[in-house]
A protein has these predicted regions:
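Bacterial N-terminal signal peptides
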Residues: 8-15
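Positively charged n-region of N-terminal signal peptides that target proteins for export
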Residues: 1-4
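Extracellular beta-propeller repeat domains
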Residues: 18-395
């Protein structure tokens, strides 16, 4: 079934207007069954180069009785053909929740949060050339790895985990995945505390500096944005969320680098809280270094709220896109875009339908395949109730 919606411009900086445009089309292209095909995808899909071939993971499901998750492949050039390429086990790790990352050597790297030798998950590699799965590193005293960033030039894989070896507030780690498989080069770079924030959710490497957002705690209890050298030294607080609640609380989604002729910006999103809205913010990295400003505020009943996985940069460099996990007309979330090179206008493009068949509770973000065609995952709903992969085409 295909679903249609008209575009609504909801808010941007100080601009508020409503209008319509030709209809945008959304449809579920895969219904997870809860068994062999997997269940509950909680992360984004990635595209291998510009091939139209996508890979993703499900947290649960698979052909084992313990519902340990799978790696799957979707070929958008062959009528969205779906294939499971790996079934997780107690030995190979289980319950992957972070998005895969693509390496120049035609490998995918990912992480699991449970199972493996010590029960705390692992880092793994799936080779796209020979289809071999290898465990790279098994966590022994760090738990719940939840985001990864690969620097292809150095071969260093960076990541965050909810629990660090010395604290329960989380950590940042790195491992060399280019020169040794399995790797013995694992290193914890930084352990969070109450003041620096807890539960780091995403990180990015820009100009030899790591930027990491944390979901809670910090000076005002609502999360932080932290900057540090790529070796974990010289950690500095960029911003403590909650001081100005209009800027949002609880930053959660991935950080996106946007550059123009004069300035580099990091764009991020906040989930919001009871007395604090979901927002889009940006931080200047060159001119006006580390100055944070509000880009847009979400309205739950119109444009949606809780953009779980943040933004993606579009083929069109002036635009970023994302999905919300709540709100909108049907309270199942929305698909939106924001103008990152102009007035910051925030536009709702699609409401997730109310009938559950499309899928809902979007914890993963989007991938743009071609121009104006987007694929994403929903954690719940669909024909069997275990989530979907959906496609949205905008006009």
């Amino acid at each position: 079934m295909k679903y249609f919606v008209s575009l609504v411009i909801v808010a941007a900086f100080t601009i508020i207007s409503v209008g319509t445009s030709p209809q945008n089309v959304g449809e579920p292209i895969m219904h997870f069954s809860g068994n062999t095909s997997g269940a509950n995808p909680q992360s984004s899909l990635i595209e291998v180069g510009n091939t139209g071939i996508l890979y993703g993971v499900t947290r649960n499901g698979g052909n084992t009785s313990d519902d340990l998750g799978v790696i799957y492949r979707i070929d958008t050039t062959l009528n969205n053909t779906f294939t499971v390429v790996h079934q997780f086990t107690d030995i190979t790790g289980c319950h992957p929740i972070s998005s895969l990352v693509f390496a120049n050597d035609l490998s995918l790297f990912g992480s699991t949060i449970r199972c493996s030798q010590f029960g705390y998950g692992n880092i793994f590699r799936y080779n796209l050339s020979n289809h071999i799965f290898n465990v790279i590193y098994e966590f022994a005293d760090i738990a719940n790895p939840n985001s990864l960033f690969l620097d292809n030039d150095s071969g260093l894989l960076y990541g965050t985990a909810d629990v660090g070896s010395s604290t329960f507030y989380g950590s940042v780690f790195t491992i060399d995945v280019k020169h040794e498989i399995p790797s013995t080069t694992f290193k914890q770079l930084f352990s969070f505390n109450y003041g620096t924030g807890a539960f780091p959710s995403n990180l990015i490497l820009v100009n030899n500096s790591l930027y990491i957002n944390t979901q809670i705690f910090g000076q005002y209890g609502a999360g932080t944005l932290i900057k540090m050298d790529r070796d974990g030294e010289n950690a500095k607080l960029v911003y403590a969320f909650g001081r100005d609640k209009a800027l949002g609380c609880c930053p959660w989604g991935q950080l996106v680098l946007v550059a123009d002729e004069q300035q580099q910006y990091l764009y991020g999103t906040t989930m919001g809280a009871a007395d604090c809205p979901s927002t889009i913010y940006r931080v200047g990295l060159t001119m006006m270094t580390n100055q944070i400003e509000l880009v847009a505020t979400f309205n739950e009943t119109t444009v949606g709220s809780a953009p779980y996985d943040g933004l993606i940069q579009s083929v069109n460099p002036s635009l970023s896109f994302g999905v919300t996990s709540q709100g909108g007309i049907n309270n199942h979330g929305t698909f939106f875009r924001v103008n990152v090179s102009g007035d910051g206008s925030l536009e709702k493009l699609f409401d997730f339908p109310s009938d559950d068949m499309f899928g809902y509770q979007t914890q993963g973000g989007l991938v743009e395949v071609g121009n104006n065609v987007f694929y994403g995952t929903a954690n719940l709903g669909g024909k069997y109730g275990f989530g979907t992969v959906y496609k949205i085409t905008i006009s």
